Amino acid sequence: MTTLAAATKRLLSRLHDPTVAVDTEFIVAPTSMEEAAEILGAATAVGQAVAFYGAGTHRQIGNPVDADLVITTTAMNRIIDYQPDDLTVAVEAGVTLGELEAALTDRNLTAVLPETEPNATVGGVVAAGRSGYRRLRYGPTRDRILQATAATGYGKVVTGGSPVVKASTGYGMPRLLTGSFGTLGLIGPVLLKLWSQPRAAATVVVDDAEVARNVAYRPLAVLGTGGNARVYLGGTMEEVDAQVEAIGGRSSDGLDWPEPHDPPLRLSFRIPARFVDEAVVAARDLDATDWVAQYGVGIVEAGYDRITSDGFSAARAWAESVGGTLVVEASPNDLRRKLGAWGSPPDSVELQREVKDRFDPAGICNPGILPGGI
């Protein structure tokens, strides 16, 4: 063993985390971004492929990665700076959504992250580019990340963005990191824009989601499920009552989100919003056991016990023909390799490669997880 390799092994052994169950020799939990950068620099020097792990809730999305080393964020789980008057909070990547939302209740605030994933980590949600159902009202997660820090593949800690709330719709590193699946490095602390929880909220069960969406004024979400369609409303009591009356249907107080499911196979149709109804038909034609359709957003997530290759190929071809894609979000690795996690690479794939090369020139960070083998 070379001196460099021996030093790397000592570094990784010092930070070993035995609590994370993944199939690789080294699992390490740095306590700071500087330690993470040191690990990544050492991994680059000896040519080790690195994967990243938060709570493991999004590990089955993307092409399978054969990693020599896994870096976890379990030891970086602090709420660093909470400024409720400024509507911002800075958190480390290992903080779970449940922990974050619990800390915001004292001032009736929310980070508007996925509502049904309390065990997911902030870093994992950002890396996977996940947004909650309230995206219809508040926009995607990337629009609420004001500032972000990452440890790059070349072993440096970099920060981008601005702590000023008005910069939340700008461009830069926060947007590059969102949905990057760790291909640019380990996502660390992020500064999030917060929103006030509505004073009143209601869930309205309706017959036709699209018709109800056109009647509702700025609903939080409009969802179709295997059982019914629901409109989610938030605002003052007067606003909510008026909308409930205008929409009709059966209403209840509060936000009754769909129960999360954990099927052996989960697919996500990501299509222009006008094709949601057609995507629901495509999902059902594949014998979905459950589904949630996000009207006005263009996402239909569906669970399956099994699927045929021909049926899947036809569904993916349809999704791509209308300008979308069909993503395998959960499945055994061998099936994901057979079906292909993403489908056809996007037109921006070469630009993505250039960005990857800037942050991770040795290509060690989650190699091959993204479309086109990035």
Language-model region placement:
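Short amphipathic alpha-helix segments
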Residues: L4-L12, T203-V222, D241-I247, R270-A288, ...
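FAD-binding subdomain of flavoenzyme oxidoreductases
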Residues: D106, A111-P114, P118-A221, T225-R230
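Conserved glycine-rich FAD pyrophosphate-binding loop
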Residues: I61-D68, T74, E117, K156, ...
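N-terminal glycine-rich flavin-associated loop
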Residues: D17-A51, T73-T116, R130-P163, R199-V205
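N-terminal accessory segments
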Residues: M1-F26, A42-T57, A315-G343
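A generic structural motif
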Residues: G226-E238, V297-D305
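Terminal amphipathic helices with adjacent charged low-complexity linkers/tails
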Residues: Y232-D253
